[in-house]
Amino acid sequence: MSDTITLPEVEERTDERTKRQPPYHVILLNDDDHTYQYVIAMLQKLFGHPPETGFKMAQEVDKTGRVIVDTTSMERAELKRDQIHAFGPDPRLPRCVGSMSAIVEPAG
């Protein structure tokens, strides 16, 4: 008598619910009421970008009017957009009365 047990073949399935969610961009929009120093500090605090990356992003938003500062899940992108909106005015500019603006767009 053999002690070997043979199990039936099991077909592997990919559950549709486990597919990754599509990525979204957090896009910072330019304005004239915030300094490069403000942008660099905000990007460092909210996204962990080093000062060099923050400076490059500040240059791009100043030149083109917008810059992608993060690509992530929709939920995190919305949170980061809201954090940008709540970051507060630039204390270096007396005329500055509020935060910068940002939007969320599909990355595709």
Where are the regions a protein language model picked out?
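Terminal domain-initiation and capping elements
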Residues: M1-G108
